[in-house]
């Protein structure tokens, strides 16, 4: 059996090709069922996200040719269309690649945690369709353990490297608990949606979404349990917010110094955090001059993100060392299983010979043959039976001119330590 990983990702393939090779939920079921019945595949998992499509399998052959042909045929493409963008790994390299993917080291955003959840979901899907067994299943179990170790022993996921996540991290640094805060989100685009998701994950449960059109904001409100207001209503609600995060496409500022002064007064000077992600700015720069106000712009966030990227690179080096160690340990353990099977088979072989010879000897004694004669015959036959296979192997190695093989057999049998 050979562990094999092949696929395409954001580094090797265009969006157009990634779309063609992606597996929808319906396609995933069909694909896993095909692989389960494939004569050369014993176990398989498919990881398909917006940035990658990868097939992990345990196969009866080496080399990726059969799997490349299957992947192309399944998506009604020619092998030539996908071959330039494909990468593949075997055995320890395949194990190492999977661990790197699950730990976020192969992601567009270094160290991003979402990929681990996606890999786990792929594993559960493969389980559901009874497509994963044996060695591959053990590899995925090991990978999840390694990912946990990497998250625990390194800071690969501890530093924000996206604007949305950096905004939430900043809020968490200033306010001890986000569950006790009210957050006003200005805008309802993709960035604000990501901010909302991060805030809810961090325990925030009081969201107000202000947007030019309430229909768009209503979608966020439904998903995250937020209150919806229009942009003109911001002045009357601003004092309720401990945190304001803004990202609109407005050409002019939406929140002015005077508006914030009134809000601070109504709050009896309890501090407010403003995170202005918009370009041009949504919050007047003069707001930052007010007491009890913390104002951060997108430039401030970018400097934080750049610093965090460098810290993640250091953590990534530590993570790579862990993965190299763990992938080597996994393959060593896997090879030891092969030795265990061989030892068990050899013991069974020897036991069968022993039991057969013993049965014959006892029967001979019962039939009146002298015990001394039976013992001599037993020892001779037992010796001949046990040395037959290694004797043939040495003769064959000598006949074929294979001195290395002959040397291994001699070492295995301990012949080099016997003095003439």
Curated annotation (Swiss-Prot):
The pathway entry for this protein reads as: Porphyrin-containing compound metabolism; protoporphyrin-IX biosynthesis; 5-aminolevulinate from L-glutamyl-tRNA(Glu): step 1/2
- Subunit organization: Homodimer.
Q: Keywords of this protein's UniProt record, alphabetized?
A: NADP, Oxidoreductase, Porphyrin biosynthesis
Q: What is known of its domains?
A: Possesses an unusual extended V-shaped dimeric structure with each monomer consisting of three distinct domains arranged along a curved 'spinal' alpha-helix. The N-terminal catalytic domain specifically recognizes the glutamate moiety of the substrate. The second domain is the NADPH-binding domain, and the third C-terminal domain is responsible for dimerization.
Tell me, in a sentence or two, what this protein's role is.
Catalyzes the NADPH-dependent reduction of glutamyl-tRNA(Glu) to glutamate 1-semialdehyde (GSA).
User: What's the superkingdom here?
Assistant: Bacteria
Provide the E.C. number(s) assigned to this enzyme.
Answer: 1.2.1.70
PANTHER family registered for this protein in UniProt: GLUTAMYL-TRNA REDUCTASE (PTHR43013:SF1)
Residues of the active site are 50
Q: Which reaction does it catalyse?
A: (S)-4-amino-5-oxopentanoate + tRNA(Glu) + NADP(+) = L-glutamyl-tRNA(Glu) + NADPH + H(+)
Q: Which GO terms describe its biological process?
A: protoporphyrinogen IX biosynthetic process from glutamate
Site features described as Important for activity, chain residue numbers: 97
Question: What GO molecular function annotations does the UniProt record carry, in alphabetical order?
Answer: glutamyl-tRNA reductase activity; NADP binding
Annotated residues that bind substrate are located at 49-52, 107, 112-114, 118
Per its record, how is this protein called by name? Glutamyl-tRNA reductase
Name the family the entry cites: Belongs to the glutamyl-tRNA reductase family.
Q: Which InterPro entries match?
A: 4pyrrol_synth_GluRdtase, 4pyrrol_synth_GluRdtase_dimer, 4pyrrol_synth_GluRdtase_N, GluRdtase_CS, GluRdtase_dimer_dom_sf, GluRdtase_N_sf, NAD(P)-bd_dom_sf, Shikm_DH/Glu-tRNA_Rdtase
Further information: During catalysis, the active site Cys acts as a nucleophile attacking the alpha-carbonyl group of tRNA-bound glutamate with the formation of a thioester intermediate between enzyme and glutamate, and the concomitant release of tRNA(Glu). The thioester intermediate is finally reduced by direct hydride transfer from NADPH, to form the product GSA.
Pfam families, alphabetized: GlutR_dimer, GlutR_N, Shikimate_DH
Positions annotated to bind NADP(+): 187-192
């Amino acid at each position: 059996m050979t562990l094999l990983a092949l696929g395409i990702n954001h580094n090797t393939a265009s969006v157009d090709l990634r779309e063609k090779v992606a597996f929808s939920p319906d396609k995933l079921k069909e694909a896993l069922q095909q692989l389960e019945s494939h004569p050369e595949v014993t176990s398989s998992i498919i990881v398909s996200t917006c940035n990658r499509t990868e097939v992990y399998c345990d196969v009866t052959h080496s080399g990726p040719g059969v799997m490349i042909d299957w992947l192309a045929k399944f998506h009604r493409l020619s092998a030539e269309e996908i071959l330039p963008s494909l990468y593949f790994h075997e055995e320890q390299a395949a194990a190492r690649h999977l661990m790197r993917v699950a730990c976020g080291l192969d992601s567009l955003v270094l160290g991003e945690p979402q990929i681990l959840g996606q890999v786990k979901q792929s594993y559960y899907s493969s389980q559901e369709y009874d497509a994963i067994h044996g060695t591959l299943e053990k590899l995925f179990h090991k990978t999840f353990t390694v990912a946990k170790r990497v998250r625990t022993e390194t800071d690969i996921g501890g530093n924000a490297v996206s604007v949305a996540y950096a905004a939430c991290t900043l809020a968490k640094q200033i306010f001890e608990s986000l569950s006790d805060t009210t957050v006003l989100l200005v805008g309802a685009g993709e960035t604000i949606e990501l901010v909302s998701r991060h805030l809810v994950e961090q325990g925030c449960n009081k969201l107000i979404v202000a947007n030019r059109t309430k229909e768009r904001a209503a979608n966020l409100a439904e998903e995250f349990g937020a209150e919806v207001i229009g942009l003109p209503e911001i002045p009357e609600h601003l004092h309720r917010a401990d945190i304001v995060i803004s990202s609109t496409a407005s050409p002019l500022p939406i929140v002015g110094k005077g508006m914030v002064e009134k809000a601070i007064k109504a709050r009896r000077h309890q501090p407010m955090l403003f995170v202005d992600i918009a370009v041009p700015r949504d919050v007047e720069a003069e707001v930052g001059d007010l007491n009890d106000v913390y104002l951060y712009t997108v430039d401030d966030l970018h400097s934080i993100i750049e610093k965090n990227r460098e810290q993640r690179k250091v953590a990534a080096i530590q993570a790579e060392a862990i993965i190299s160690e763990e992938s080597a340990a996994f393959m060593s353990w896997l090879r030891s299983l092969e030795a265990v099977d061989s030892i068990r088979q050899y013991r069974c072989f020897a036991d069968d010979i022993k039991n057969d010879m013993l049965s014959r000897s006892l029967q001979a004694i019962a039939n009146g043959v002298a015990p001394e004669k039976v013992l001599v015959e037993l020892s001779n036959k037992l010796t001949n039976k046990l040395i037959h296979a290694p004797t043939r192997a040495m003769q064959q190695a000598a006949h074929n001119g294979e001195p290395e093989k002959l040397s291994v057999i001699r070492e295995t049998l301990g012949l080099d330590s016997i003095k003439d």
